[in-house]
Amino acid sequence: MDLLAELQWRGLVNQTTDEDGLRKLLNEERVTLYCGFDPTADSLHIGHLATILTMRRFQQAGHRPIALVGGATGLIGDPSGKKSERTLNAKETVEAWSARIKEQLGRFLDFEADGNPAKIKNNYDWIGPLDVITFLRDVGKHFSVNYMMAKESVQSRIETGISFTEFSYMMLQAYDFLRLYETEGCRLQIGGSDQWGNITAGLELIRKTKGEARAFGLTIPLVTKADGTKFGKTESGTIWLDKEKTSPYEFYQFWINTDDRDVIRYLKYFTFLSKEEIEALEQELREAPEKRAAQKTLAEEVTKLVHGEEALRQAIRISEALFSGDIANLTAAEIEQGFKDVPSFVHEGGDVPLVELLVSAGISPSKRQAREDIQNGAIYVNGERLQDVGAILTAEHRLEGRFTVIRRGKKKYYLIRYA
């Protein structure tokens, strides 16, 4: 199947401006395309992943992707999908975030590809020096207020109010498309479904300034979850692509906990497995859902894509250790990663009675309860059940000399650190 047909099979096409024309172009020519990423935080998150990987699919099919970091548009704020005005971030902050995002995007695209190397650009390079008179004459002149008011991103904010700053955002994004069309021969812009209005504004600007130009837009659907909760969020917050903000273990766990109703769709969106491989996993899901083979494959493929083979191996080791209780064989780095979000307590001093530590660390509310917990077999130290109320924790109980992992009951973990 051709590229557009594959994207449609994967469910990655929400809207296109001219499907037949785009298919013909993609089948006949090497197309330069772009997608923009505004730096609204110091990292991209998994909500960006479907779009990033779609760019990679285009490159693998022989086309040339440009990742555009919104160093300028990030200073303005996109109203699309937002119910209220964004807080304006400082220029220095946006610059720092832009650099981080540029580095992250670089992991997914091939900048050395023979014939179609990817590029990364920053729209501050051309919007920053643009003076207001030139902008109003060369760009603003081509947009009627009526046209802009009809856009969903503006319509949805009429009641609550929208500043002129955010109102003008679509013109800046339209100018990006025109600029890349002129300087890079860029014929296609892709983006999330909320970007349809901004993309079509760019096509309109190209049409008005260049005549009947052949440029196209394609949007990718919003990733949803069958249970109605927001994709990419957990109880502990957003799932980021930066391993310092979301550890590879947490990242792996997010995917392995995917609902049966979502997992095949996510395999199509987020992996490069073939149609045959995904259909085989779909059949296995129907026949033996308890094996969770589709979820394991999804977690492994996406973690490897984002964090690499070694991080995937660590994530699997941590997961298996927590499941089996074999915590003693984890490295210090793996313990830090696997227990990053559990309650922790710093013990200052040497050997300590287990009962005393359980109370001081807040694991058991009183010494009486601590003794009961131990006698009832509810306390595990480094994966081993301890039922001796007189037990003393010594240097032997310190993993890598730095940690003791205590579990109370089936799932309540605590990390003891030593000063």
UniProtKB/Swiss-Prot annotation:
| Intervals of motif 'HIGH' region | 39-48
What result follows from mutating E152A?
Mischarges tRNA(Phe) with tyrosine in vitro. Toxic for the cell, probably because it alters the discrimination of TyrRS against non-cognate tRNAs. The toxicity is abolished. Strongly increases toxicity. Enhances the toxicity
Which residues are recorded as binding L-tyrosine? Y34, Y169, Q173, D176
Looking at the record, the residues that make up the S4 RNA-binding domain are: 352-419
Question: The motif 'KMSKS' region: which residues?
Answer: 230-234
Q: Summarize the impact of F339L.
A: Has no effect on charging of tRNA(Tyr) with tyrosine
Pfam family for this entry, one: SYY_C-terminal
Query: What sections of the protein cross the membrane?
Result: none
Q: How does it assemble?
A: Homodimer.
**Annotated protein name in UniProt:** Tyrosine--tRNA ligase
Q: Which organism is it from?
A: Geobacillus stearothermophilus
